[in-house]
Amino acid sequence: MLGDPPRLTIIAGANGCGKSTFTARSSFVYRIPLLDPDAISKALQPTAPGRSAVAAARKVLNSACQHIEKGEGFAVETTLSGKGYLQMTLDARARGFEVVQVYIGTERVEINLGRIRDRVIAGGHDVPEVDVRRRYLRSFQNLAAGSVAPTT
């Protein structure tokens, strides 16, 4: 609607929780740009997307900054395993964005590991188990930190 603030939608959760499944089935994503590090990584290096993960993450953060500077709404997928998205949220709010966070979680990391195994069998990308386990805990910790971030 006219006059509504731009919206930053953060779709968060640990590796293998179902972020991409959620966005693929969510009609709101078709109306705004979606910054998906996994899709960018695959585009950068189709045969070994894991090798371009850092470059993809950098590209997502740069694109997010551009959208925020222009006042354009967008969505972004993240594991929330780093602190960069907390700062992005603060920057977006400071520029008048409405920030919506959708967190997708599972009861235990083994569910995520099983989903990743299934994804690999289906031709998708793998994530090392040690990374999944580390990010699983960090994701929940950063979710809690982001939940108490100032809203003004």
Q: Residues of each region from the PLM?
A:
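The Walker A (P-loop) glycine that initiates the GxxxxGKT/S ATP-binding motif of P-loop NTPases
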Residues: 10-13, 78
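A glycine- and Lys/Arg-enriched "phosphate-lid" helix/loop adjacent to the NTP-binding pocket
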Residues: 97-142
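Glycine-rich phosphate-binding loop used to anchor ATP phosphates in small-molecule kinases
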Residues: 52-104, 136-139
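Conserved nucleotide-binding/hydrolysis micro-motifs of P-loop NTPases
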Residues: 39-41, 81, 105-111
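Phosphate-binding P-loop
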Residues: 1-6, 67-68
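NTP-dependent small-molecule kinase module
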Residues: 145-152
